[in-house]
């Protein structure tokens, strides 16, 4: 028999009754039932109930066992007594009668129990992550993560992609987020950077004659903490294709992502033919470029009903060019209490309030706005939004560029409060036609809106002749249930167009050569049309595991202060290490 086990703790069945077995694992739970000791033994594969009676030579040692001790049991498999089966366990029809015990590893007093689903402070969970990872929910999430990545790899290879590994030590790129810098010992005063993404390398692969590349790529960004992003590092399914249009990328990747979701959706419906929503339409209808399409609410422009109306606040606003009034329908939200609650919520979000109209019995509009604009305009709004008695509408007004984010939050809040969001499905969509440029209010200049390497729609001619703020890019995202899970684009592969694109954003050719010299050089030697995308592995896993916390699907995450509480990172280093790197510390004064 094997030194440690003949079976795993998830393997024994009724067919094993009367077999002599050896199991090893952790003492998950210990119960004393009238002299009989019941020990649930756990390993990676499952749990087996083991029993020791007072007449067993192993009983005295069994009494000393504590939770999370690592032990080896020798015993005999028997049928559980009638009425004691546990249908929730694959091993629930049998138990092991122990006749010999060996303690393989004792455990100190636990700072948090492994048994059960009780919540514990994040600091404790991260400091003792090795215990947290033994808990079933987190353990299963990590296993699901591995299986999802396996599915991604298999599906990518099925459609002709090859996996390559791009460098981890690379050159710093000042645009975008801050780099994590790595000092060079051999080249004093110079630094490598950890890649924010393999963007330039994957484009260089296409220029090197490869056709379809992918990798599960680690990416590093020294960003301030955000609720929807882990500090430090994240992983993406990164890919690039040569000689493709935007349609080719969609045709290749939509089945891959759909298939991965279907593999792990646990029977929940997954969108088959993804809608394509232009960026501008997404903002107007949903107030976000990553809409949750499970929420049926669609915003509409109702400016015409307030222009010249008795509600002077909106009427005066609409006298200024560019201002609009948007309505968010609230089906079954037509009670004073609910409308007042939404108004209070808006004030809590830093807004002056949230105007509303309620439609009561007989279809009459009610509320301050209805009283000011009159029944005819109120009825016209109701008809435009397709509402009825018992419903409500909520209004935001002003410059859409300034209020669309809040409008999107209000739409989401209404969907949640009115229980309109079907949590048991995955709604995927392409968001297309992103603007190439936006106006940077802080720096008072035109800047890139998204990826600076994207091809402008209309190519070089558009860059030379159009108002930059009207140029759209061959840039696209994938949205799922309110999250951006992928982003990509067709690349600007012509040197003249690349230089012009950066020139519009205020960067001269010398800056392009300085920052992106390797790729710019490669463009001079025959660059194929190419494009691709990167899908966020962590967010996809998070959605499929049914959680909204990225730490619940990551092995050893940092806390929100970018600290690894288990390993003690970041840490001090020795004077000798700093001397070898020619670095002297100049720390801020407290």
Swiss-Prot record:
Homodimer. This is Aspartate--tRNA(Asp/Asn) ligase. The record marks 33, 83 as: Important for tRNA non-discrimination. ATP binds at residues 221-223, 484, 536-539. Belongs to the class-II aminoacyl-tRNA synthetase family. Type 1 subfamily. Pfam families: GAD, tRNA-synt_2, tRNA_anti-codon. PANTHER family: ASPARTATE--TRNA LIGASE, MITOCHONDRIAL (PTHR22594:SF5), ASPARTYL/LYSYL-TRNA SYNTHETASE (PTHR22594). It is an enzyme of class 6 (ligase). Aspartyl-tRNA synthetase with relaxed tRNA specificity since it is able to aspartylate not only its cognate tRNA(Asp) but also tRNA(Asn). Reaction proceeds in two steps: L-aspartate is first activated by ATP to form Asp-AMP and then transferred to the acceptor end of tRNA(Asp/Asn). Its EC number is 6.1.1.23. One of its GO terms (cellular component) is cytoplasm. Keywords: Aminoacyl-tRNA synthetase, ATP-binding, Cytoplasm, Ligase, Nucleotide-binding, Protein biosynthesis. One of its GO terms (biological process) is aspartyl-tRNA aminoacylation. GO terms for molecular function: aspartate-tRNA ligase activity; aspartate-tRNA(Asn) ligase activity; ATP binding; nucleic acid binding.
């Amino acid at each position: 028999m094997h030194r440690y086990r003949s079976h795993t703790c998830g393997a024994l069945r009724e067919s094993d009754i009367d077999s002599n077995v050896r199991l090893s694992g952790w003492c998950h739970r210990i119960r004393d039932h009238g002299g009989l000791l019941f020990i649930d033994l756990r390993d990676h594969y499952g749990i087996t109930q083991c029993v020791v009676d007072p007449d067993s030579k192993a009983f005295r040692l069994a009494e000393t066992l504590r939770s999370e001790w690592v032990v080896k049991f020798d015993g005999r498999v028997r049928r559980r007594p009638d009425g004691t089966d546990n249908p929730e366990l694959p091993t629930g029809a049998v138990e092991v009668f122990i006749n010999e015990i060996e303690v393989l590893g004792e455990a100190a007093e636990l700072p948090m129990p492994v048994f059960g689903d009780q919540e514990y402070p994040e600091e404790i969970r991260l400091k003792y992550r090795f215990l947290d990872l033994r808990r079933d929910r987190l353990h299963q999430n990590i296993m699901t993560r591995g299986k999802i990545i396996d599915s991604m790899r298999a599906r990518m290879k099925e459609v002709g992609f090859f996996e390559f590994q791009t460098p981890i030590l690379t050159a710093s790129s000042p645009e975008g987020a801050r780099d994590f810098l790595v000092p060079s010992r051999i080249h004093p005063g110079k630094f490598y950077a950890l890649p924010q993404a393999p963007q330039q390398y994957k484009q260089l692969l296409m220029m090197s004659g490869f056709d379809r590349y992918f990798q599960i790529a680690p990416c590093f960004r020294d960003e301030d903490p955000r609720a929807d992003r882990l500090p430090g590092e994240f992983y993406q399914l990164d890919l690039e294709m040569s000689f493709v249009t935007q349609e080719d990328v969609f045709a290749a990747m939509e089945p891959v992502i759909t298939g991965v979701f279907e593999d792990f959706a646990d029977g929940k419906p997954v969108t088959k033919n993804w809608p394509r929503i232009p960026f501008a339409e997404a903002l107007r209808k949903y107030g976000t470029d990553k809409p949750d399409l499970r929420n049926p609410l669609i915003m509409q422009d109702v400016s015409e009903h307030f222009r010249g109306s008795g509600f002077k606040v909106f009427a005066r606003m609409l006298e200024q060019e560019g201002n609009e009034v948007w309505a968010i329908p609230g089906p079954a939200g037509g009670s004073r209490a609910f409308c007042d609650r939404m108004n209070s919520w808006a004030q809590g979000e830093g807004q002056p309030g949230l105007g509303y109209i309620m439609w009561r019995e007989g279809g009459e509009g009610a509320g301050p706005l209805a009283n000011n604009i009159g029944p005819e305009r109120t009825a016209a709004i109701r008809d435009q939004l397709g509402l009825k008695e018992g419903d409500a509408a909520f209004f935001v007004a002003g410059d859409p560029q300034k209020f669309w984010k809040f409008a999107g939050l209000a739409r989401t809040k209404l969907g949640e409060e009115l229980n309109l969001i079907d949590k048991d499905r995955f709604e995927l969509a392409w968001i297309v036609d992103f603007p190439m440029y936006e106006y940077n209010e802080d720096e008072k200049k035109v800047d890139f809106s998204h990826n600076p390497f994207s091809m402008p729609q209309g190519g070089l001619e558009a860059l030379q002749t159009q108002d930059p703020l009207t140029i759209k890019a061959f840039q696209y995202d994938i949205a799922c249930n309110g999250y951006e899970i992928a982003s990509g684009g067709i690349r600007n592969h012509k040197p003249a167009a690349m230089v012009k694109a950066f020139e519009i954003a205020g960067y001269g050719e010398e800056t392009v050569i300085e920052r992106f010299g390797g790729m710019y050089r490669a463009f001079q030697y025959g660059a194929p049309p190419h494009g691709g995308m990167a899908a966020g592995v962590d967010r996809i896993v998070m959605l499929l595991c049914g959680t909204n916390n990225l730490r619940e699907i990551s092995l050893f995450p940092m806390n929100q202060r970018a600290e690894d509480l288990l390993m003690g990172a970041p840490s001090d280093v020795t004077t000798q290490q700093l001397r070898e790197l020619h670095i002297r510390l100049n720390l801020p004064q407290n």
